[in-house]
Amino acid sequence: MRPTRSVPIAAVATASALVLAGCAGSPAAAPAADVAADPVYEGTLTVLTKFGGAPLEDYFEDIAAAYEKKHPDVDVELIQETDQSIKDKTKTLTASQALPDIYFTWTGDWAENFISGGLAADLTELIAPGTEWGDRFGEASLSAFESDGKYYGIPLYNNGKFMGYNKSAFADAGVEVPTTFDELIETCAPLRAAGYEPIAFGNKDGWPALHYLQQLFAYNVPSDTLRADFDPETAAWDHPGYEASLTQFQTLVNDCTDSGKGTNGVLYTTAQEALAGGRAAMYYQEVLEFDTVTAEGATLTTDDFGIFPLPVPDDADGDPEAIEGAPEGYLINARSPRAALAADFMKFATEPERAATLSSLPYGQPSTVVGAVTEQNSSKAVYEGIDRVNQASQLVAWLDTVTVPEVADAWLAGGEALISGSATPEEVLDSVRAANDGAK
């Protein structure tokens, strides 16, 4: 599994410039896209996807063919890019003012740049919770593309972070699934005594540490405060829940991993393989990884694989029902003369039967459409994970995509420093505050 969060952190560094470049020379008051108008079923509709390459590319090709069959006077032109190439293609198209009618987006700062730049159509009337289209999706997925009370994005597939565990290892050690963070730490000694690495962890790429931190932030910091701290103009990063989270993270690294201070030299795939190979009892992972750890050849079986949310610390001040994760989806070009047709196409693309296809092999992308991920077309763990994501009170996006690049980089360095022991929690927070001040 490729760490998709790392793409926007590189891309987002240029996103503001891209949007400005795309806006340069355009009329001062471009007409707003009327996405709620009756679509005119003629002409060419352009769509920039992130499904380039086998097997994903067939998904939108099949949808385009079906839509063209239903509406013979419409030609759907697909621009299919990969996870690696999408950011450069978006840069080129935005700078040349050739942004397609529909285009891929991540959540967080990346999407916000297109929204604030006037390049994303307001879809509130069509897709807000309570609308016919919006009710197809979990509210948390829709909220990931919400800005100032308006809804801009069409969530396509979902993801979330959970602790995966080996049920047999827990049985061997005589421990139960923990319900608090302290209980999680308390399971580590008996698991190690039973011959397992309690929690496999690899942070060579930097972002895995941030996944622990962001989930702990969601638990320990009130949601309004956390959201305000994602914006440099309103951020303070001074709630005591941050320092508590950093301390809890250090405890987990020191007490529950065999790699300890050397975790920064371990790949996340090595940690993943430790759980799959039956050597580790737990590994903190994304829903998209679930089927990897029980794939053919793995020691860990689907029957022995279980998941649970990272347990909530006692006396936490945040949201105990929040799940860290983020959907990926699409925006409609606010300046497209075919905005209504674009909205109609995306309604077609997210109909339940197509959402079920997306969630099934060979695609295996858990659709954000509620009910699309079933026990029949998905593994038990994926089904459970996506159900939990859909029922979450909110999705808290990856720390390195929801913050601006300067702050994200400070957190990446801070996570590594906490692991190695080269900085204290307060020193890490000082560096984040300094980066935030520089980003204002």
Regions found by a protein language model. Name each.
Residues A66-R136, S168, D172-T179, E273, ...:
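Extracytoplasmic "Venus flytrap"/periplasmic binding protein-like
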Residues P190, D231-T263:
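Glycine-centered hinge/linker elements that transmit conformational signals in sensory
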